[in-house]
């Protein structure tokens, strides 16, 4: 047929374009523009449009057998099994499972498709309307295979990369890597072949075996392209520039070396002065080690002034001080460190306390006490400031930590001595009370009042107070030495050691005072019950018998410690006194006053007749019982 009014008329034998009824199959409207062949392959709608244009412009072939009147999708989808059709529908609707398809959604899609269907027609210019490129890409149905129908189709995810695209990208990356490797290998081979003509050993060593077999060595050469010669002016200018750069570099190096030399010289002077001060003030007997200052965060030298290495068990103070170099004053500072995390450094007010012994004597008429003795400061240098002398500061710190440990051990021992007249007034004072006397051990600050008390006139018991204080300090040293000896000996017991057993500070002093009072009372009882009644009777105090030392050690250090500790055996031994009362021809009464814990009194009485035969041998703990027993002996056996 011929064109009519600018429009192309189609032959009936070749078929006419029709619009498929969407009720034939429940697919999206965009799928209507695409045709699916019987073998499952897809044909783009754009290609059909192109073929229709070619039909309108070219003569139409009269062959009705080669062209089908209607390409019906129902022939493919209608006869498709459900196990293939359902996954296809789910994929086209972006659904993950068949249960997500509801009747309301299907009705809504049908209504939207009925409103949005566009029939393909001819425009006034004879062209056929075509869809967008993006729409055409969506109209291509996928090829249906058995593997795809059996597998569960997952919903499309725009952010995820398909496996095929990922494999394609992987292949491209590998191709680029192989290409770069080949190019670098080719460059290396080229350089090796070029180098083999100049330096054969180096070139042949870097050539690959394939290149050695394929190309002879030294077969590639290169020529040097000479630069145009410079004239005299350019040569002179270049020489001047080179010399200028060299001179400038030399001047910069000179200035840099001079600056660094000045810094090193200054640092060397500071270090020399620092170590000179340390060697001047620190002796070989001081324990010096490295530690980090928690206040400055720098590593510094520290001095250990505590007595832990000497056997001390005092844990309240580490006994460590940091040597800090004050750059402003150019001097060393000794700063003690506390165990507490809150307080890093100990102030002078908290450490400068020393022990003082006060002796008060009771006034019988007024029932009051008067100060009759006070210990003095044995080292007068403690009262003088020593901010610049590190050795004196170390000596002061050693003295004060020893005094604090002494008070700590006194308070620890006084807990078990409260039944015998020992009590606390505050954390810095321990009081020992005895008949007619009161002894106070107090930690007092080192201030002007301590200095003024040293100039007061001497009292009656000042010497006795000093002796008691010296005795306490010596006994603390004995405790340290016993701890050292225990550390040198092998452990023979699995039981945990208790230091309370060797804590003998107040007990020897209190034991001597109480034993003296007990002895006076016993003498008074014997005088009243025996001497005043029996004529010609007398009493005498027998000399004490010395006990031989039974400690022998083969090891030299242990033997030396035993010898040093043995010097205090007489003080540490429990007090014991023997009294002999002579009754003339009636016999002898021997009384032995001893103690089991330094503080109590045990009285042993032995009465022997004139023939030396022991008549009574008994022990008393009460003076009233002793008095009654002496009355019994005198009345029954003497008179």
UniProtKB/Swiss-Prot annotation:
One of its GO terms (biological process) is positive regulation of transcription elongation by RNA polymerase II. Residues 48-57 have a biased composition (Low complexity). GO terms for cellular component: core mediator complex; mediator complex. Keywords: Activator, Coiled coil, Nucleus, Transcription, Transcription regulation. Its main location: nucleus. Residues 32-43, 58-68 have a biased composition (Polar residues). The keyword Nucleus applies. It is found in: Nucleus. Residues 245-271 form a coiled coil. Component of the Mediator complex, a coactivator involved in the regulated transcription of nearly all RNA polymerase II-dependent genes. Mediator functions as a bridge to convey information from gene-specific regulatory proteins to the basal RNA polymerase II transcription machinery. Mediator is recruited to promoters by direct interactions with regulatory proteins and serves as a scaffold for the assembly of a functional preinitiation complex with RNA polymerase II and the general transcription factors. Belongs to the Mediator complex subunit 17 family. This is Mediator of RNA polymerase II transcription subunit 17. It comes from Eremothecium gossypii (strain ATCC 10895 / CBS 109.51 / FGSC 9923 / NRRL Y-1056). The lineage of its organism: Eukaryota, Fungi, Dikarya, Ascomycota, Saccharomycotina.
């Amino acid at each position: 047929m011929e064109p009519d009014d600018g429009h192309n008329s189609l032959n009936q034998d070749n078929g006419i374009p029709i619009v498929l009824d969407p009720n034939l199959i429940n697919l999206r409207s965009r799928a209507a523009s695409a045709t699916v062949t019987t073998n499952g392959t897809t044909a783009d709608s754009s290609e059909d449009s192109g073929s229709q244009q070619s039909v309108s412009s070219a003569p139409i072939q009269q062959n009705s057998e080669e062209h089908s009147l209607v390409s019906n999708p129902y022939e493919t989808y209608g006869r498709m099994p459900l196990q293939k059709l359902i996954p296809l529908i789910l994929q086209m609707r972006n659904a993950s499972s068949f249960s997500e398809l509801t009747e309301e959604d299907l009705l809504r899609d049908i209504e939207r498709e009925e409103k949005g269907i566009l029939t393909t027609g001819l425009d006034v210019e004879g062209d056929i309307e075509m869809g967008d490129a993006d729409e055409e890409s969506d109209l291509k149905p996928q090829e249906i295979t058995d593997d795809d129908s059996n597998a569960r189709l997952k919903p499309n995810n725009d952010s995820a990369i398909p496996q095929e695209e990922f494999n394609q990208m992987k292949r491209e990356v590998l191709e680029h890597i192989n290409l770069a490797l080949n190019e670098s290998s080719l460059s290396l081979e080229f350089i090796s072949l070029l180098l083999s003509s100049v330096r054969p050993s180096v070139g042949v060593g870097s050539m690959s075996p394939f290149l050695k077999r394929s190309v002879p060595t030294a077969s590639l050469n290169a020529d040097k392209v000479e630069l145009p010669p410079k004239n005299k002016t350019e040569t002179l200018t270049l020489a001047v520039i080179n010399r200028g750069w060299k001179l400038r570099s030399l001047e910069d190096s000179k200035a840099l070396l001079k600056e660094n030399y000045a810094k090193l010289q200054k640092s060397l002077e500071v270090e020399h002065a620092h170590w000179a001060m340390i060697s001047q003030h620190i002796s070989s007997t001081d324990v010096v080690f490295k530690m980090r200052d928690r206040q400055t965060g720098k590593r510094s030298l520290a001095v250990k002034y505590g007595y832990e290495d000497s056997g001390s068990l005092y844990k309240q103070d580490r006994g460590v001080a940091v040597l800090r170099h004050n750059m402003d004053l150019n001097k060393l500072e000794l700063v003690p460190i506390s165990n507490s995390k809150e307080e890093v450094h100990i102030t002078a007010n908290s450490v400068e306390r020393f022990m003082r012994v006060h002796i008060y004597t009771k006034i019988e008429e007024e029932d009051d006490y008067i100060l009759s003795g006070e210990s003095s400061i044995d080292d007068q240098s403690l009262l003088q400031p020593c901010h610049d002398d590190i050795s004196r500061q170390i000596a002061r710190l050693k003295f004060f930590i020893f005094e604090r440990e002494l008070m700590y051990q006194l308070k620890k021992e006084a807990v078990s001595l409260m039944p015998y007249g020992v009590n606390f007034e505050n954390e810095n004072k321990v009081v020992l009370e005895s008949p007619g006397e009161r002894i106070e051990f107090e930690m007092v600050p080192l201030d002007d009042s301590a200095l003024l008390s040293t100039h007061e006139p001497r009292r009656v018991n000042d010497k006795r107070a000093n002796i008691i204080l010296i005795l306490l300090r010596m006994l603390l040293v004995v405790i340290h030495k016993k701890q050292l000896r225990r550390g040198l000996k092998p452990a023979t017991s699995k039981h945990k050691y208790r230091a309370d057993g060797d804590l003998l500070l107040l007990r020897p002093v209190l034991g001597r005072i109480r034993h003296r009072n007990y002895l006076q009372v016993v003498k008074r009882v014997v005088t009243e019950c025996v001497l005043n009644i029996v004529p010609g009777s007398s009493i005498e105090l027998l000399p004490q018998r010395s006990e031989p030392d039974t400690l022998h050690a083969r090891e030299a250090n242990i033997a030396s410690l035993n010898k040093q500790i043995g010097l205090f055996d007489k003080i540490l031994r429990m007090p014991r006194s023997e009294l002999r009362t002579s009754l003339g021809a009636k016999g002898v009464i021997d009384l032995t006053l001893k103690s089991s814990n330094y503080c109590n009194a045990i009285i042993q009485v032995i009465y022997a007749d004139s023939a030396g035969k022991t008549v009574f041998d008994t022990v008393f703990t009460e003076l009233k019982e002793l008095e009654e027993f002496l009355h019994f002996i005198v009345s029954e056996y003497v008179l």
